[in-house]
Amino acid sequence: MKKIGVLAIQGAVDEHIQMIESAGALAFKVKHSSDLDGLDGLVLPGGESTTMRKIMKRYDLMEPIRAFASEGKAIFGTCAGLVLLSKEIEGGEESLGLIEATAIRNGFGRQKESFEAELNIEAFGEPAFEAIFIRAPYLIEPSNEVAVLATVENRIVAAKQANILVTAFHPELTNDNRWMNYFLEKMV
């Protein structure tokens, strides 16, 4: 059975754990670098990316997560996770640099501009995925190595590169497990 960790420093940790378990994998909370040992994949949940980055640095998690990815292990970042995994963050904040694109934080606006949208994901077929965007980022300037999986208003909101999958929205806040299934079946 696949073992998936969820970075448990802030954000929708419990919701991701429930989604992982409902997809048939084992879920573990990751708070320290040693918690990465033995995992097949890692989820960086939504939350507040600046706060998450500061905590990751304080607990010395940045380099171990980069090393985890360099071993070919899969990482799935949602919302703030997308921001943290991007090569660059607009404004120059430090990131993990694992997907070759630039993240625009709060790209669709602040909390009051949160919204839902139907996304037609080729890999999923019908029906459309009901995506929940909360202070959502998006990606710009992807390299040729990045596969764009979904856009809203011509903005990249889901993408993958090698073993890295990112969404600007929160699949863990829905009852639709197709993103986690995709991660487990195609990436891990």
Curated annotation (Swiss-Prot):
Protein name: Pyridoxal 5'-phosphate synthase subunit PdxT
Annotated TM spans: none
Alphabetized InterPro entries for the sequence: Class_I_gatase-like (IPR029062), PdxT/SNO (IPR002161), PdxT/SNO_CS (IPR021196)
Keyword Cell membrane: no
A single GO cellular-component term on record: cytosol
Residues annotated for L-glutamine binding in this entry: 47-49, 105, 134-135
Reaction catalyzed: aldehydo-D-ribose 5-phosphate + D-glyceraldehyde 3-phosphate + L-glutamine = pyridoxal 5'-phosphate + L-glutamate + phosphate + 3 H2O + H(+); L-glutamine + H2O = L-glutamate + NH4(+)
GO BP annotation list: glutamine catabolic process; pyridoxal phosphate biosynthetic process; pyridoxine metabolic process
Subunit structure: In the presence of PdxS, forms a dodecamer of heterodimers. Only shows activity in the heterodimer.
Known role: Catalyzes the hydrolysis of glutamine to glutamate and ammonia as part of the biosynthesis of pyridoxal 5'-phosphate. The resulting ammonia molecule is channeled to the active site of PdxS.
EC identifiers of the protein: 4.3.3.6, 3.5.1.2
Pathway(s) served: Cofactor biosynthesis; pyridoxal 5'-phosphate biosynthesis
Keywords: Glutamine amidotransferase, Hydrolase, Lyase, Pyridoxal phosphate
Organism: Listeria monocytogenes serotype 4b (strain CLIP80459)
Stated family: Belongs to the glutaminase PdxT/SNO family.
Pfam families assigned: SNO
MF terms in GO: glutaminase activity; pyridoxal 5'-phosphate synthase (glutamine hydrolysing) activity
Gene3D superfamilies, sorted: 3.40.50.880
